Amino acid sequence: MESSILERCFSQSKKEGRIALMPFIMAGDPDVNTSAEILIMLEKKGADIIELGIPYSDPLADGPIIQKAASRALNSGTSPKSVLEMLSTLKTKLSVPIILFTYSNPLLNYGMEEFCIDASKAGAAGLVVPDLPLEETEKLSSIALSKNLDLVLLVAPTTPKERMRKISQRSNGFTYLVSVTGVTGERSALENRVQLLINELRGFSSTPVAVGFGISDTKHVIQVKRWGADGAIIGSALVKRISNATTGQEAEEAGKFCSELYKATSL
């Protein structure tokens, strides 16, 4: 089977001796136009793949920082449709692959097939749906793949081994390894068992492994690279920088942080 755009991205960063840098931002925080500027800036400052969150009112997997960002985005009128429309306008300006991070409820409300069609037209490369159980991924995966979208599945430290094997073999693009038990958020240290989980996933499939939830600084990026991960996903720490930025300086602040993180990808 031909490799996907995401898999090619991981191959490229590996060739360069780097771990892929994968920042996450919440679309519409503070508004969709600023999100568009931030996406362009992140690509400019070294992002290999960007995760774009679609705001939802009940984000079970997310900690307080991302929950607040989702609230701000919803209050500014952001919807799945407005996110995809914004993404469409960037097709000629962005070449970095975009993964849409959405919960199953907004996806089902939109219509699974319609969402995949519109996401693909808007130029997205993949989807992450954190609350979709493995047993329900088959239909979405087949629709997504038919529209050239990878459906990325998540593995947590609490996932039983046999289930972990199934997830890693069914995940497309990469396997999303959740580094901690619980919700997204900044952590001061990463647990050593993340390394064991990376090794276990390596034994199950050749799909790249990206680590997220709790990666918040250059030290963590270096750590997961040494542990053998293919990608480092940085969410809450970046979302916090954006929310703390002076109005009009959000893209600038995001770019500075991305530059710092990028330097760590080859260490």
UniProtKB/Swiss-Prot annotation:
Reaction catalysed by this enzyme: (1S,2R)-1-C-(indol-3-yl)glycerol 3-phosphate + L-serine = D-glyceraldehyde 3-phosphate + L-tryptophan + H2O
SUPFAM superfamilies to which the protein is assigned, alphabetical: Ribulose-phoshate binding barrel
NCBIfam families: trpA
Keywords: Amino-acid biosynthesis, Aromatic amino acid biosynthesis, Lyase, Tryptophan biosynthesis
Gene: trpA
Function comment: The alpha subunit is responsible for the aldol cleavage of indoleglycerol phosphate to indole and glyceraldehyde 3-phosphate.
Family stated for the protein in its record: Belongs to the TrpA family.
Pathways involved: Amino-acid biosynthesis; L-tryptophan biosynthesis; L-tryptophan from chorismate: step 5/5
Enzyme Commission number(s): 4.2.1.20
GO CC terms: cytosol
Active-site residue numbers: 51 (proton acceptor), 62 (proton acceptor)
One example GO MF annotation: tryptophan synthase activity
Keyword Cell division: no
Protein known as: Tryptophan synthase alpha chain
Origin: domain of life: Bacteria
Subunit structure as annotated in this protein's UniProt entry: Tetramer of two alpha and two beta chains.
Pfam family, one: Trp_syntA
HAMAP family reported for this sequence: Trp_synth_alpha
